[in-house]
């Protein structure tokens, strides 16, 4: 079966080369027919799992389409070449070709297809090169935002934010989450704004920037419904505990369902949050009662010392 498909692919390549030849009666190459044959060759090689040959056929198809000024079809062929590289586990090279395809989609006036290609590239590279994935997700978000497709844009920004948090790139994460929050506010998804405020505060506290964390909460009071919400109350309690270096109070808030059931990356931030100086334990109820006894004992000892030599 594989050998048959390989032979089929080679036949299509030979036909494509014929279409590209010029002669006395044929002055111009037939790029359209050549591209079609290269495409068929790529499919045959792919079915035979000969991904290197399939990739080469896709690239030749792309060039033929470019020569024919068919940018959309050229972009599709470059994207397919990228997918063949993915099958060969050559992910950085795959992403490079898919990025090229997305730029051509934009030139061709098909931004939606460009955005989908960029998102696909981000998913491919996410586990290998998170930094590149962040860049791709942000590019995708920009394309969607330019098209006023804000819900899709904010979804991609969310992916970028989580990767930044995972990589402990907190300064960039704080900016990314703020951008998410602004869009959610614009589309009037206020409950999600509350969650983004929690994420912001956790990121700022991991940056050891209490002032920025407090400012986030203060600014969120203007969001309809935030003041008086459980999110607001929890954040006020968290900031109070952090400010007073009360690790118990901070841990109690961060272990609450409100924090634990956030996106995993933010839940981990909460669970790993340590107050400055390592924190102190809350005083147990018995402690205040013990103090007077201790003070009285010390006073009694001092009195004994004063008269330890006896009376004259």
Curated annotation (Swiss-Prot):
Keywords: ER-Golgi transport, Golgi apparatus, Membrane, Phosphoprotein, Protein transport, Transport. It is found in: Membrane; Golgi apparatus. InterPro entries: NSF_attach, TPR-like_helical_dom_sf. Residues 300-312 have a biased composition (Acidic residues). It is a peripheral membrane protein. GO terms for cellular component: Golgi apparatus; membrane; mitochondrion; myelin sheath; synapse. Required for vesicular transport between the endoplasmic reticulum and the Golgi apparatus. Interacts with RAB11FIP5. Interacts with VTI1A. Belongs to the SNAP family. This is Gamma-soluble NSF attachment protein. It comes from Mus musculus (Mouse). The lineage of its organism: Eukaryota, Metazoa, Chordata, Craniata, Vertebrata.
């Amino acid at each position: 079966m594989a050998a048959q498909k390989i032979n089929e692919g080679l036949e299509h390549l030979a036909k494509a080369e014929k279409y590209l030849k010029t002669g006395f009666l044929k002055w111009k190459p037939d790029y359209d027919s050549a591209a079609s044959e290269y495409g068929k060759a790529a499919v045959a090689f792919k079915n035979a799992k000969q991904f290197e040959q399939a990739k080469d056929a896709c690239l030749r198809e792309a060039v033929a389409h470019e020569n024919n000024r068919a940018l959309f079809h050229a972009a599709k062929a470059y994207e397919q070449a990228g997918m063949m590289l993915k099958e060969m586990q050559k992910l950085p090279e795959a992403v490079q070709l898919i990025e090229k395809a997305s730029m051509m989609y934009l030139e061709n006036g098909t931004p939606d297809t460009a955005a989908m290609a960029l998102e696909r590239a981000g998913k491919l590279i996410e586990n290998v090169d998170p930094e590149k994935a962040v860049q791709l997700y942000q590019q995708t978000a920009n394309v969607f935002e330019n098209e006023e497709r804000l819900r899709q844009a904010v979804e991609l920004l969310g992916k970028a934010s989580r990767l930044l948090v995972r990589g402990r790139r907190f300064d960039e994460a704080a900016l990314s989450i703020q951008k998410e929050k602004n869009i959610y506010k614009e589309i009037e998804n206020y409950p999600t704004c509350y969650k983004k405020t929690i994420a912001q505060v956790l990121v700022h506290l991991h940056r050891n920037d209490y002032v920025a964390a407090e400012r986030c909460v203060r600014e969120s009071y203007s969001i309809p419904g935030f003041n008086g919400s459980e999110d607001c109350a929890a954040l006020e309690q968290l900031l109070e505990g952090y400010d007073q270096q009360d690790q118990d109070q901070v841990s109690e808030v961060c272990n609450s369902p409100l924090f634990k059931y956030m996106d995993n990356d933010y839940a981990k931030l909460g669970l790993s949050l340590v107050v400055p100086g390592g924190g102190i334990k809350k005083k147990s109820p018995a402690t205040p009662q013990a103090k007077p006894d201790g003070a009285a004992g010390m006073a009694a000892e001092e009195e004994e010392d004063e008269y330890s030599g006896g009376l004259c």
